[in-house]
Amino acid sequence: MSQLKYLITFSILLRFGFFFFGLYQDEYMPVKYTDIDYLVFNDASKFVYQGLSPYLRETYRYTPILAILLIPDNFGKYWYHFGKLLFMVSDVITGLIILKLLSKQQQLSEKKKMILSSIWLLNPMVITISTRGSAESVLTVMIMLSLYYLLDKDNVILSAIWLGLSIHFKIYPIIYLPSILYYLSSQETPFLASVPGINLVNAKNLKYIIITLTTLAVVNYLMFLKYGWEFIDNSYLYHVTRLDHRHNFSVYNMVLYYKSALLEDSNGFDIEKIAFVPQLLLSAVIIPLIFAKEDLISSLFIQTFVFVAFNKVITSQYFIWFLIFLPHFLSKTKLLTTDKITGISCLLLWIISQATWLYFAYKLEFLGENTFDNGLMYSSVFFFLSNCWCTMKFIQSL
């Protein structure tokens, strides 16, 4: 147990090291460490602190709750980085919950638990994202609390409340609801065992969906009362028709780029409005039906990996969404035991396909070379196909 304490202590110190280096870089280097999103969060929180709407800050496309959480940023000079510290704490708590859920697997040694939890706790990408001021860790801690109360405490009510809050915070965790409901269908006798479809319904999952949707509805209603339609438009509707072609790994990147250049009154095909169809069909329907009953967290990992791969906008922050489930998945998969070559191949292909895209993005952004058609388009397709191949191997490895 002392080794685990050392791991946690070191992970905290590592985050503070990144944080203080970030302060130095912001002060003395031309390329800033702090994420531009943090400046947006901070400005939005300033408006809330003044009793105004966070949506007065242009490009703030998030729930008002995030701006409310960051109100202390405005208490004075030394409070400016309060939000980063909040994200770092959420980051560590996420890691602790990952460790707690791994501890439920009696067959895992302490050493293996440490190694697997280190994938999150000592991951430089995870640490960089939270210490730069990205709010993803607030979302991950909500999702992991939902799983903690469901799988460790068997508390359906608290689990459903946390899931409802996470869906409010960002829409995508709603894809986890079918998996959880399907998982819970195996926990109790269904109401009508002989009726197809209805035979999945029992008291537990019925309670879960009611509490989840009620929590979501109540929080959304409160935010709507305060901020009106601008809350709905910016937090939800904007993301359905979003055209974001910059810093975007997605296979839809080039389509969105050319679409954004068209006149607003053009009659072009609105691919951004239907891109979610194959994405949701795979991540919210097919994968849960195959895996959720057998291994809930592994199902969530594959769902999220596919959801990100098929998303019309992909940035490095989105990788955090499936990394929270990776330690558990690796504890169950053959990719670390009898099929290590495939596991290494997946890792290398995922990294190389990203690096290829980043190379052409660097040439475009910093060297001013036109790499859209010859570089970024092909590297986006390469990244997408690499993710598809990895998904196939993930499924085969369980």
UniProtKB/Swiss-Prot annotation:
Which residue windows are transmembrane per the record?
4-24, 79-99, 114-136, 156-176, 209-229, 271-291, 305-325, 341-361, 375-395
> What does the entry give for GO biological process?
fungal-type cell wall organization; GPI anchor biosynthetic process; hyphal growth
The domain of life for this entry's organism is: Eukaryota
Q: Mind listing the GO molecular function terms for this protein?
A: alpha-1,4-mannosyltransferase activity; glycolipid mannosyltransferase activity; mannosyltransferase activity
Location(s) in or outside the cell: Endoplasmic reticulum membrane
Pfam family, any one: Mannosyl_trans
Entry's Gene Ontology cellular component terms: endoplasmic reticulum membrane; glycosylphosphatidylinositol-mannosyltransferase I complex
- Function recorded in the entry: Mannosyltransferase involved in glycosylphosphatidylinositol-anchor biosynthesis. Transfers the first alpha-1,4-mannose to GlcN-acyl-PI during GPI precursor assembly. Required for cell wall integrity.
Q: Which family does it belong to?
A: Belongs to the PIGM family.
Q: Which PANTHER family does the UniProt entry name for this protein?
A: GPI MANNOSYLTRANSFERASE 1, PIG-M MANNOSYLTRANSFERASE
Designated name of the protein: GPI mannosyltransferase 1
| Organism from which the protein derives | Candida albicans (strain SC5314 / ATCC MYA-2876)
